[in-house]
């Protein structure tokens, strides 16, 4: 039962509020809404010269006037629709080649004013959060609303046990790696050296399951050659790691107990530097992507371009590429004369074996890449971006790791991602560019860099 006070029993402030709600209708700020979806911006994406209809929702009979405010002026909006709770106002604009910034302003009959942009409804306008129309900026339609399934390959399914990382195969961060025999064993706290044996054949074997689950896109954590199970310390951007793909040459020995010298890890050296293994792994990956596409699913791979790994062939801190039966250039750790010297920032000139390179967040296993100091490095990574979205691999997009950290300045970071976008989109216009970023991604989403970001903020700190 609802109890209602009589006006005689109301306190003074309650009487005042009752009067205001009846004589001076309160502006219902929470009823205001607009966004960049088709319901409120039609079309959501446009080209120069297109007419775009912009819509604002308000409380029913709550607003006297509504305005669309753009860089070019203020336009009175027309009420075009209503339902039981809301009114809908609309205005149209014709876009040019320039980005169009806009927000909404509403007024009540009694002069109350409120603004609405991406931050929501407010009494004071902060134009930093205005909506933007970016002519020509289009995200691939297949990515919108797609169900994406992330696969950390080592922990998904083991389809080719003969490729498993072996006990003592090599040394990583001070200890030997090991093969986990019990798939259900809980990982150790420092479990980067533990390999459960998941591989791409395991993914292939489960494609029926993924398809029946309703997956639209498979997003793979890094797949390139790497000594860790997470593979965010890439050793070779040109090849899929044979441990998760195809090993056709498998010669050499594992490390003896107590031996931490990876030049003696000849089994590992053969597995990851022998071009027969590397080329077979790339061919296998191309076949897997083709099979995934046949089932109507897409593939996104992880691009770790801010830093590489200390095992990387450009640095070769472990001296494994200099021990390979195939010919590789000397690494920048080994020799000052290395063709990759400029790929890294060194703080001393003490060669050979110069360990003074800059590591991302101080981690010597994650050498930061020195783009500003090396045009050759920049061109190499731009070619990598193009390579994997092109024939024969035909990957459908990149997920960019710590994308805002790349480079040593914000100015260069934006410059690089503009070049990366052009390189990728020229090769495959339907490839998506999805960045990892915490915080406000506004500056990267102006149509010339990333397509979108992973929504870490909302999930981790809602």
Region locations from a protein language model:
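Active-site cleft segment of glycoside hydrolase catalytic domains centered on the general acid/base Glu
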Residues: 367-375, 402-421
